[in-house]
A protein has these predicted regions:
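Catalytic nucleophile-His microenvironment captured as a short glycine-rich beta-strand/loop
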Residues: 75, 275-309
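Conserved catalytic-core surface of thiol
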Residues: 294-365
């Protein structure tokens, strides 16, 4: 999500380079997810531990992945800051131990809340979140409430230095309504196309809204992606990145590995069957930035900007064949202006609510 906004800001203000602080967003992301978990535990405290929703909550108390809806809710609530205003820390770049500690503490808190009287839970939850906040400060630092930033021109010459709050910085340099200006589309052949789906707890902020997914044939999704790229607008894109990935070359191609010949067997499941059996699903979010079209305007290859560093893949990017796109692309977030009216009209439907453990739900890393 931040990479999409970064590209817009660099282009709009002709900046030599720019990065938002992922650490700042991560701080509030983890704090809000902690609140989401604790409140969900309070809401389900009358259900037995064996209840599938309760079980799922304790299995997934927190994670550092997520969806575009989480990014949009967080940014609209807390704003953004430049990377220099809240730099990365060791823990923000190596989140495993921090996430483990937070998960352990949240599970402990969850059990405590389930054993309390209902009238006591709200006050105790605030105390618990204070402890979570302290852990986050130790790991990630204190989020700035005000900072100075110097805007430079394309040659690196200072233009102006001003003070901002995270919200005023976002309002001035981005200013979009992220919660209403974008549409999430998905390709899930295991479900009916033309329908809108919602997944329980598919958000990062308790008082936010679950994201709505419009399920579409892959060709309709490609049409919107191509229109956006032609207008120089990058998109949030998610896929099953581990399948047929050549990390060294930075390619995603179903021809990268020939497992059938190697093991003398066949792998016959199609995309629908892989989703149904949990063999494939959306696992990683990147930024879709380019497409290679043939003479007839049909896509041959696609390029995404990844978050694994410039030394990973092809200059920090991955290139996928169109065949791989068909098989392992799952979600795309598109600005409304690139979405045909007949697809926008689908949002008027009553969405189908899916449980949190549905095969299509996986917090994207």
């Amino acid at each position: 999500g931040l990479n999409v906004l970064r590209a817009k800001m660099i282009d709009k203000y002709d900046l030599p380079s720019f990065e938002f602080s992922q650490n700042y967003c991560s701080f509030y992301d983890l704090l809000e997810k902690s609140n989401l978990f604790l409140q969900a535990i309070i809401d389900t405290r009358d259900k037995p531990m064996e209840d599938r929703t309760v079980t799922w909550l304790f299995q997934h108390p927190i994670g550092d992945g997520g969806q575009f809806t989480g990014v949009s809710n967080l940014i609209m609530k807390y704003g953004v800051v430049p990377k220099a205003a809240m730099p990365e820390t060791y823990q923000s770049n190596n989140t495993g131990q921090m996430t483990m500690i937070l998960s352990l503490k949240l599970r402990e808190f969850g059990l405590e809340l389930r054993g309390m009287k209902a009238s006591q839970t709200a006050e105790r939850k605030v105390e618990m979140l204070t402890e979570i906040y302290r852990i986050l400060v130790e790991c990630l630092g204190v989020p700035p409430t005000e900072f100075e930033w110097t805007r430079c021109d394309k040659d690196g010459n200072p233009v102006e230095t001003r003070s901002y709050t995270p919200k005023s910085f976002y309002d001035e340099y981005i200013g979009e309504d992220l919660e209403h200006n974008y549409v999430m589309v998905m390709n899930d052949p295991s479900r009916e196309y033309g329908k809108v789906y919602e997944i329980e707890y598919d958000r990062h902020v308790y008082d936010g809204e679950n994201w709505l997914y419009i399920n579409l044939p892959i060709e309709r999704i490609k049409e919107m992606a191509i229109a956006s790229i032609k207008d120089n607008t990058a998109m949030y894109f998610s896929c099953d990145v581990g399948k047929f990935l050549d990390r060294t070359k930075g390619t995603l191609d179903v021809a990268n590995m020939d497992y059938a010949s190697l093991f003398g067997t066949s792998f016959t499941m199609d995309k629908r069957q892989r989703v149904q059996t949990y063999a494939s699903g959306s696992s990683h979010a990147m930024t879709l930035i380019a497409v290679d079209l043939d003479e007839a305007g049909a896509p041959r290859k696609w390029m995404v900007e990844n978050s694994w560093g410039a030394s990973s893949g092809y200059q920090g990017c991955l290139i996928m064949t169109d065949e791989w796109f068909n098989e392992y692309m799952f979600r795309l977030v598109v600005e409304r202006k690139y979405v045909p009216q007949d697809i926008l009209d689908m949002l008027n439907q009553e969405p189908v609510m899916l449980p949190a453990w549905d095969p299509m739900f996986a917090p994207e890393e």
